Every structure is written in structure tokens, then in C-alpha cells.
């Protein structure tokens, strides 16, 4: 299926010259970063930010190229290609899908799409490349979605469009996401904007991999048990009151199954809301779920919860945003010494300025305070504070 996604993207680019309706764009995202705290998760640590203990550095966060190819009024192809210095391949795909949505003159409309795409879960990550128009770093919830979740399958949607409001219901069936949950269990929540590509790997903490004599990397988009997962969602949108979203997700993985690595049975409920009050944008989301692996008679389950509240204000070329996150995990294990618990909070403040269409500058400060018992096993203090300040320059075309 992942090879099919590549072929879909290639067919889109090949057909671009003959297309009558091609749109899209791209960007190069540079960062000047000052960060302190634990070693970053991408470097094998237990840190809670993308750049961890890097200190002062200049980074290419990513470069992306995305496009819509409208083959007809009903049929659309979308692809999002990305380069990021630490990814496994020179160019990777974040999404690639085809959508069929017949023209409807009635209040009812339906659509179906197939390929690889993000589940309809985010209130904040609404821009291309699983990015947010408000901050550089997404919430803990949406950082995890970008790292471990992708719908590689088919989603059907039904919409009812009223004069002032809209109702949507979607159901999806997917595969190749049997490892989703391993990062939550082995590392906990992380506030990061590094999205895992379809052909990329996910880094696990060195402290976890070494005792198991296993690799420190996992391929999150892997099919192990040949059993499809699914999700179902409902959304209500009112032009004056805002939007309310509900999603239930279950990858239906068999926690006993093994094929180079074990499957993780991951399921959760997500509730999100967005509105505008006196010119202030309010975004909020809550997630609660668990993930289970059972390589022997003794299973291992990690419960996880997270929530955030974001307030944003736009004035001309400027945007200002402040967000508060809370998050927690707790493992259920027969061996008390193997149980891991985590809780933490994060505060994010960002100011962005877009003086011209092709340039956006963003200054962001992030503070994460977390307590994780796992650190004690590696002679680290269980309570840690991570700081990260970034000046981002996004060049868009």
C-alpha cells in the first residue's frame, strides 16, 4: 500500500502537464533554535521537545512540495512530498490520496477517498504538511498524531449542509498502522513538529532498546496481523458558534502478533472544539485511550490522556497565540517495578508576522515540565524541565 502511495504521487506529477486544474505550493522552513533540557527523542533520549539539548543551532526543519490535481469536478488527487534532514529517504511522502466527491445540488453530499492521509482529528494542524497556522510546535496530541498515525486505506464521508450549520459523519478502514502506540508506551508524550513520513522510521529511547537487545527504531506504518483497523467520527459546524468534533479510533491490532516486531493494540477517543469569541480564536482538544502489547502471558498496557487549550488572535499581518497542554500516561503491569507513570504540563507562546505572501516569521517559546518514573531506572531525576525558543523563517512558493 505504501508503494501504491508513491505511484499515486508519481501519477499526479506525471499528469500535471496535461491537467486543466492544478494547484499547490511548497515551502522551506528554517529555524534558529535555543534549546535546553534532556536529549531529544529523535536522538534516543527522553526529552519532551524536538531539539532537546542541542543548545544554540540553525536547523532546516523541513522543505515540502504539495499539490492538488483536479481531474474533474468530482475527482481530485493530492500529494504532499517532504524533505527533512534526519529522515531515512531523500524525499518522503506525508500524504497521497485520491478523492471522489460527486457534485450535489441537495443538502446531502457524500465522498470517498483512498490512499494515505491523516485522520480527521486536529483542530490546530490545518495547514499543509500537518502544520499549524498558529505555532511552530503543535500540541502533545497532534505531535503524536503526526509521528505515529496515518490512515492507509479508505474513508467514506456523508455531509448534510444547512443554511447555517453542517453535519459530517465519516468511517474509515485502514491497515499498516499496527505499531501505533509504541512511542506513547516507551517514551511518553513529546511536543514536536517533526512528522514521520510514510517510509521513515520512529526513534525509540536508547534506554528502552538496549535492555531488550532490540533496535532503537520502529517503522510505524507496518502491517503485522493482516487485520484492518477502523475509526468513526462525527462533526458539527455552525457559522456563528464554531465546530465540535468526535472521533473513535481502534487499529484492531492483535497484541500477540509478531512480524519482525510486535503489534500494539491502540484505541482512543478524541473530542475537539473550535470557536471565535470577540475576535479571539479558541481551540481545544481532549484525548483518552490505551495501547497494549502482549508478547507473552503477561501483557503490558499503557493508558494515555492529553488535552490542550489554545487562544489565538489575528491582527492584519500578525498572529499571536498561547497554548496550555496537560498530559499523562500510566502503564498497567503485573510487575510493580516495570510500571511507568508520567504527567506533565506545557506552555507555548508564539508571535508570527507575514509581511509578504512568500515569507512568514515566527518567534515561539516553549516550556515543558514533566515527571516520568522511567527516568529513575537510568539514574536521571524523574522531574525535568525542557525549554525551547525558536525563530522560524518559512519561505513559501
List each model region and its residues.
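Short, linear, compositionally biased motifs with a strong N-terminal bias
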Residues: 10-11
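Short, P/G- and charge-enriched loop/turn segments at secondary-structure junctions
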Residues: 52-53, 140-143, 218-221, 259
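Signature for the C-terminal beta-barrel architecture of outer-membrane proteins
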Residues: 21, 90, 102-112, 148-314, ...
Amino acid at each position: 500500500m505504501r508503494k501504491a502511495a508513491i505511484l499515486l504521487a508519481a501519477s499526479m506529477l506525471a499528469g500535471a502537464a496535461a491537467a486543466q486544474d492544478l494547484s499547490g505550493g511548497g515551502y522551506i522552513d528554517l529555524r534558529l533554535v535555543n534549546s535546553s533540557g534532556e536529549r531529544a527523542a529523535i536522538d534516543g533520549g527522553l526529552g519532551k521537545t524536538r531539539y532537546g539539548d542541542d543548545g544554540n543551532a540553525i536547523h532546516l526543519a523541513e522543505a515540502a512540495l504539495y499539490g492538488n490535481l483536479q481531474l474533474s469536478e468530482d475527482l481530485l488527487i493530492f500529494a504532499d512530498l517532504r524533505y527533512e534532514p534526519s529522515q531515512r529517504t531523500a524525499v518522503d511522502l506525508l500524504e497521497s490520496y485520491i478523492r471522489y466527491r460527486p457534485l450535489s445540488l441537495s443538502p446531502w453530499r457524500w465522498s470517498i477517498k483512498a490512499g494515505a492521509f491523516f485522520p480527521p482529528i486536529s483542530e490546530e494542524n490545518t495547514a499543509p504538511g500537518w502544520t499549524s497556522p498558529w505555532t511552530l510546535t503543535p500540541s502533545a496530541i497532534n505531535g503524536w498524531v503526526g509521528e505515529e498515525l496515518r490512515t492507509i486505506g479508505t474513508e467514506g464521508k456523508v455531509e448534510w449542509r444547512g443554511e447555517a450549520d453542517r453535519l459530517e459523519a465519516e468511517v474509515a478502514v485502514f491497515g499498516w498502522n499496527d505499531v501505533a502506540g509504541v512511542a506513547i508506551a516507551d517514551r511518553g508524550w513529546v511536543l514536536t513538529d517533526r512528522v514521520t513520513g510514510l517510509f521513515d522510521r520512529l526513534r525509540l529511547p536508547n534506554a528502552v532498546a538496549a535492555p531488550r537487545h532490540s533496535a532503537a527504531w520502529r517503522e510505524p506504518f507496518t502491517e503485522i496481523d493482516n487485520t484492518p483497523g477502523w475509526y468513526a467520527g462525527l462533526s458539527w459546524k455552525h457559522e456563528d458558534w464554531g465546530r465540535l468534533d468526535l472521533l473513535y479510533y481502534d487499529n484492531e491490532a492483535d497484541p500477540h502478533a509478531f512480524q519482525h516486531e510486535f503489534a500494539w493494540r491502540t484505541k482512543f477517543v478524541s473530542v475537539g472544539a473550535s470557536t471565535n469569541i470577540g475576535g479571539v480564536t479558541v481551540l481545544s482538544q481532549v484525548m483518552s485511550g490505551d495501547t497494549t502489547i502482549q508478547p507473552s502471558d503477561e501483557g503490558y498496557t499503557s493508558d494515555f490522556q492529553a488535552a490542550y487549550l489554545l487562544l489565538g488572535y489575528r491582527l492584519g499581518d500578525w498572529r499571536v497565540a498561547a497554548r496550555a497542554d496537560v498530559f499523562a500516561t500510566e502503564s498497567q503491569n503485573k510487575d510493580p517495578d516495570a510500571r511507568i507513570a508520567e504527567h506533565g504540563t506545557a506552555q507555548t507562546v508564539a508571535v508570527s508576522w507575514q509581511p509578504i505572501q512568500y515569507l512568514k516569521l515566527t518567534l515561539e517559546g516553549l516550556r515543558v515540565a514533566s515527571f516520568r518514573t522511567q527516568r529513575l531506572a537510568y539514574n536521571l531525576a524523574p522531574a525535568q524541565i525542557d525549554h525551547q525558543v525558536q525563530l522560524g523563517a518559512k519561505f513559501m512558493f
